[in-house]
């Protein structure tokens, strides 16, 4: 059994070698010749999986180590009798922590408290729900917009997108990309929406580039609209609008979900799905794969305020470390993908062990996802 895996999927070689012969290949472009005798293909979001790639090939199963699936023609795979699995929620925590890192940086730079801001969350799936929970743990007001869930009658106080635009100081997008249909998200943030945002609002896109109309956004910024922008995703990736990058406050190369934990979850989820598909079901404990974190433990004295939270968050991950490298190489062919391929190891907040002498601080840090314990001062 021959299994092709994206060379940038951590732990893929070791895990899938339990099931067959493994060959690691580039994800963009996939070397087509390798598909001629392969039984399974494991990809990431950079690989377009459709009939033109797999038609006439012996592939029996495709796995994508990503939460999103808009790069996969699922209808064609089903018609062709090819098994398929994604990894829903695998990088949700990573994206939430990316958003927090960005907001805490902007709050420090611009001198505001997040408690004084209302956050509108567009898309309340794996990422949006976790983001809501962590924001509300901090006492920050959230407004939710998710028309598919609202129409299904899912639990939640869902508002219209117009309401979020009217009332939110921060608008963050966490939707799939739907190019048509009743829940179309292509250019959901169009010129009209962008112009309607509150003065001084913060716009964040960490889902799919085309959810925000990049041309319209650049037009508004060039005209001097007072708006802070965080973009991790771009229309036309791996190409991006260099002029837009110059205008945004934070720009990164589609790495919001790139924690070691998130990548490992993605790999293990598709590994488990494929093992079940071939009748040799196996399960993997994530903590058996992950290395020891960089920081063993730290001690926190007193209550948890915003500056302290910012220091803890940025100790684990400071978004500026990914903004600067992109600005240096933007516009140079191939460099966007190179930044992603050679991405520095990044951990999640759970990797940081925090000893608190304040019980409320320990409790709150645990709710936020840190590995925190309370040890009273003596």
UniProtKB/Swiss-Prot annotation:
Q: Name one GO molecular function term.
A: NAD binding
- Keyword field contains Zinc-finger: no
The catalytic residues are 208, 237, 254 (proton donor)
What Pfam families does its record include?
2-Hacid_dh (PF00389), 2-Hacid_dh_C (PF02826), DUF3410 (PF11890)
Disulfide linkage: none
Which residues hold substrate? 45, 66, 258
Pathway it acts in? Cofactor biosynthesis; pyridoxine 5'-phosphate biosynthesis; pyridoxine 5'-phosphate from D-erythrose 4-phosphate: step 2/5
What is this enzyme's EC?
Answer: 1.1.1.290
Report the locations given in the UniProt record.
Cytoplasm
What InterPro entries does the database record attribute to this sequence? D-isomer_2_OHA_DH_cat_dom, D-isomer_DH_CS, D-isomer_DH_CS1, D-isomer_DH_NAD-bd, Erythronate-4-P_DHase, Erythronate-4-P_DHase_dimer, NAD(P)-bd_dom_sf, PdxB_dimer_sf
Q: Which GO terms describe its biological process?
A: 'de novo' pyridoxal 5'-phosphate biosynthetic process; pyridoxine biosynthetic process
Superkingdom field: Bacteria
Q: Which GO terms describe its cellular component?
A: cytosol
State its role.
Answer: Catalyzes the oxidation of erythronate-4-phosphate to 3-hydroxy-2-oxo-4-phosphonooxybutanoate.
Note the PANTHER family from the entry: FORMATE DEHYDROGENASE 1 (PTHR42938:SF9)
Q: How does it assemble?
A: Homodimer.
The UniProt entry's sequence similarity note says: Belongs to the D-isomer specific 2-hydroxyacid dehydrogenase family. PdxB subfamily.
Q: Which NCBIfam families match?
A: PRK00257.1 (NF001309), PRK15438.1 (NF011966)
- What name is this protein filed under? Erythronate-4-phosphate dehydrogenase
Q: Which organism is it from?
A: Escherichia coli O17:K52:H18 (strain UMN026 / ExPEC)
The root-end lineage is:
Bacteria, Pseudomonadati, Pseudomonadota, Gammaproteobacteria, Enterobacterales
Identify the gene encoding this protein.
pdxB
